Amino acid sequence: ADTDDEGSVRGFSFITAPYEAEIGFATRLRDTAFKRVLRNLAPGAEVKLDAPYGDFRLHNNESRPAVFVIGGIGATPVRSIVAQATHDRTGHRILLLHANRSIDDAPFQADFLRFAEQNPNFRFVPVFTDAVPPLWKGESGRIAAATIRRWVPQLAEPIWYLSGPEGMVKAMRRLLVEMEIDEDDIRTEEFAGY
């Protein structure tokens, strides 16, 4: 098969939750040899999967809220986490601040809106940085300390999850540390190359 300098193996975050019947993942289909092969796979094609890795998952203590501050494709692992929490009816209070350039660039919007309808413990806050929809009354611009404080009055209470492009995740981590959030309460998932 066609390949590139990185070979034919990649790591992906699942978008599907354990209860869902199919396994799914998301990626941006750039014009690389690997992505061309991936794009041209026929439905039902056999692929080799390795065991799941990583620890970007919802914490066990339901008394502590979870706050996800994510950008763009960083929604990939969060979609599966929120789907499973909604399915299991966990007691976790979950807030998702999801930044995207525009509504057209925002992955899984319909899923997150559906989860918010189904799960009284889940709040979904879309944030648009560039193209704000007409008559939009929600959040816009970059996620800043003021944005976070509007939605999270008790900053030390939650476990914080940051997911998205590497630069965004690093900037959000710095911001949270500047806001005196304990680094032990911050979990991250960086998407290199986005």
Located regions from the model:
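Reductase modules of NAD(P)H-dependent flavoproteins
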Residues: 34, 93, 97-194
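Conserved beta-strand elements of the Class I
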Residues: 67-69, 161
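Short amphipathic alpha-helical segments
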Residues: 39, 61, 80-82, 109-110, ...
